[in-house]
């Protein structure tokens, strides 16, 4: 068996699952269950498969440049396998061309692409010749089209980002969408403290550092084979939560004895953070309309040994009708709204290809309904925090501005927008803090 064949085959299988509509992280998990790879193999497979997903448009340009048949006419299975080979040749500098080609061709030979192994070999070898001669695909000189091609983003999305932040910042954000995302943990301060847990990780030869300005944030500096096999998982000493997301719950400043609503709670990283900040001594109602996601939340609550949270399967936009006793009941409300997730494209590489302007418009309508529906549940002296993991202003500050204009009795106390940056870790995030006048 050619060295590296299984890793390429697994990566190709991930692309096939993603093309069928499975989320990239779920596809990775499903495929890895069928193999026994070590941590280095898993890191390689993750980089290769997720890189192919991110750079789909860029890799298609190279297929069009080096093949007689354009990418749109390639059989899908062949197209994705060509992406596996091309990504290694174009984006993975440490892999020799010969190894990239031979291992990728071997996948074709040992699967139902056997009859096309010669085609794979020819296209990849032709690509090497083009690389060596610096004969690259012709890319438009138009800045937006060029950025779309080089950073492999839908052109409609690039136009939107440029409209939001300008071309210079858009280039930085586009690069950030293609970098390897950080893996951040939030320490469960109900059970341990940051320095103690860092020492525990160091004893296990796990490279991790504290995140500045976050009381309980830790960054893992290398990919573990399985996140659940890290020390302290079973004991509930930590949860996975991006550093930008860890800014949200503290804005609400949950206190002992307060009644708190998390209106879109599952899978629960912010719910458990609220409980943690209130020393597990608040009355927290976690609402979500997905029973499956609520089960994940309940599992997290049990693992972290959090007792102050009760869950409710419901649509938060209907809470006033189904639970009228909750009107003016809550001291604090968190709406971590369903959103386009544009701030997390590095972490969710397939999202860029499934998003559309129409989907965003539908989400905006839902976000507006959530704000209008949940506001009556807040006490007159209460605080509401609205958050998203997007950088789209129509879902963020523009939406909040319209909400304030419509509801004259409330005011904006503060808002924060975090943009993804190529040279800094962290997702894009937005949060607004609102209260009655």
Give each language-model segment a name.
Residues 1-437:
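S-adenosylmethionine
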């Amino acid at each position: 068996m050619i060295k590296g064949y299984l890793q390429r085959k697994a990566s190709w299988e991930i692309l096939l699952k993603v093309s069928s509509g499975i989320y990239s992280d779920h596809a990775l998990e499903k495929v890895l269950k069928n193999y026994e790879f070590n941590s280095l193999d898993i890191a390689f497979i993750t980089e290769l498969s997720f890189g192919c997903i991110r750079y789909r448009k860029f890799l298609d340009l190279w297929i069009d440049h080096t093949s007689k048949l354009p990418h749109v006419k390639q059989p899908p299975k062949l197209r994705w396998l060509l992406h596996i080979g091309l990504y290694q040749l174009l984006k993975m500098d440490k892999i020799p061309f010969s190894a990239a080609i031979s291992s990728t061709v071997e996948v074709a030979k040992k699967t139902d692409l056997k009859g096309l192994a010669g085609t794979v070999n020819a296209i990849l070898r032709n690509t090497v010749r083009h690389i060596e001669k610096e004969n690259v695909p012709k890319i438009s000189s138009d800045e937006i089209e060029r950025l779309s091609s080089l950073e492999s983003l839908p052109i409609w999305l690039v136009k939107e980002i440029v409209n939001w932040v300008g071309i210079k910042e858009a280039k930085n954000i586009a690069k950030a969408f293609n970098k390897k995302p950080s893996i951040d943990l939030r320490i469960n301060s109900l059970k341990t403290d940051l320095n103690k847990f860092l020492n525990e990780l160091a004893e296990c030869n796990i490279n991790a550092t504290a995140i500045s300005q976050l009381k309980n944030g830790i960054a893992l500096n290398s990919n573990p084979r399985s996140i659940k096999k890290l020390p302290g998982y079973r004991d509930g000493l930590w949860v996975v939560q991006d550093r930008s997301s860890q800014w949200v719950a503290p804005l609400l400043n949950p206190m002992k004895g307060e009644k708190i609503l998390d209106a879109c709670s599952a899978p629960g990283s912010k719910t458990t953070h609220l409980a943690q900040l209130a020393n597990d001594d608040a009355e927290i109602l976690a609402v979500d309309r997905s029973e499956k996601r609520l089960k994940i939340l309940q599992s997290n609550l049990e693992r972290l040994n959090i007792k102050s949270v009760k869950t409710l399967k419901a649509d938060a936009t209907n809470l006033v009708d189904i639970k009228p006793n909750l009107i003016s009941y809550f001291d604090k409300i968190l709406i971590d709204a369903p959103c386009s997730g544009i701030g997390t494209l590095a972490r969710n590489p397939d999202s860029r290809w499934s998003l559309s302007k129409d989907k965003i418009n539908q989400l905006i309508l839902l976000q507006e309904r959530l704000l209008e529906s949940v506001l009556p549940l807040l006490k007159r002296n209460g605080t509401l925090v609205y958050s998203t993991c997007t950088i789209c202003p129509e879902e963020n500050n523009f939406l909040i501005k319209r909400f304030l204009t419509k509801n004259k009795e409330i005011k904006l106390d503060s808002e924060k927008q975090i943009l993804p940056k190529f040279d800094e870790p962290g997702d894009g995030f937005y949060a607004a803090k609102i209260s009655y006048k």
